[in-house]
Amino acid sequence: MRHFLSFIILLQVLISGCTSQLRYSGNPLFPGWYADPEGTVYNGIFWIFPTYSAPYNDQVFFDAFSSDDLTNWKRHERIMDTGAVEWAEKAMWAPSVIERDGKFFLFFGANDIQSDDETGGIGIGVADSPEGPYRDYLGKPLIDKFHNGAQPIDQFVFEDSDGKLYLIYGGWRHCNIVRLKDDLTGIEPLTDGTLFREITPEGYVEGPFMFIRNGKYYFMWSEGGWTGPDYCVAYAISDSLSGPFERVGKVLQQDTSIASGAGHHSVIRIPGTESYYIVYHRRPVGQTNRNSREVCIEKMEFDEKGFIKPVAITREGVPARKAR
């Protein structure tokens, strides 16, 4: 009995030691003001592509960040800037990256156009690696007009289960889905014959994101004003890519003791696992400048019915882990 108790005590000490040495990412993930992060995994490496958070006239480039364990992040500076895009002048926002045939395509918004009479919208950059450098793929915007009331910003590239690519985008409380050509040189009609199909759910403002889990389409978006404390993330679930998407509820929002304006997110799934992470931006307590936003990460979990559990924002972030 004495030997058994000694073994239990030793085991508790070992477990305690392992727990105390567990490394966490911490929040924010990396220094600097950044927003609208898209997180993904390429070749066993975590990548985050954010907006540089600054006045519009200073938003003329993108940085990217990579990590092999979610805790140590390397910054890749100016993977793309307005010097590589003749028609882009300012407000380069919300990069979304997809790999296709050995190339990496970065979709972005530029110029914050307010009408069809202005130059700007959603463009595409192309590179040989995730860290770029990216060059303009089309020499013009892919989408440069308002369709169904949607401002051409906040683009997210979505790959369906059959390998087809779609672009889900839109500001001004309207969201569209379009089908991309295989070579990404333009769009083509959806199955119903339309080019721009509106899929706007109740409460939608901007920042769409979609993923598939157990055959269901999870559509997520940001609500509220991006400069205010009420900015948050909500979601819907559907059996179809094009909906209908009936709002389930909020999944991420502010904690007044930590930060406000928690929104414009993306989701990372560890390949081959059921481990999900939500990557988002928030404004730390004490910061009143609208551009003082930082990139953070939390674990995202589901209940037995497949609904997303509410996510609490933290200062600790998530434990270190590999993507392989």
In which residue ranges do the predicted regions lie?
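Positively charged n-region of N-terminal signal peptides that target proteins for export
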Residues: 1-4
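Bacterial N-terminal signal peptides
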Residues: 6-16
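Carbohydrate-active catalytic/glycan-binding domains of CAZyme proteins
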Residues: 18-324
